[in-house]
Curated annotation (Swiss-Prot):
This is Short neurotoxin E1. One of its GO terms (cellular component) is extracellular region. The keyword Secreted applies. Expressed by the venom gland. The keyword tRNA-binding does not apply. It comes from the Eukaryota. Belongs to the three-finger toxin family. Short-chain subfamily. Type I alpha-neurotoxin sub-subfamily. Binds to muscle nicotinic acetylcholine receptor (nAChR) and inhibit acetylcholine from binding to the receptor, thereby impairing neuromuscular transmission. It comes from Micrurus pyrrhocryptus. Coiled coil: none annotated.
Length: 21
């Protein structure tokens, strides 16, 4: 699973996780 921030203007606590590479 890969987690990353969906927007750099938003805090690192809000991120998006996707199952897969």
């Amino acid at each position: 699973m890969i987690c990353y921030n969906h927007q750099s203007s938003e805090p690192p606590t809000t991120x998006t996780c996707s199952e897969g590479q």
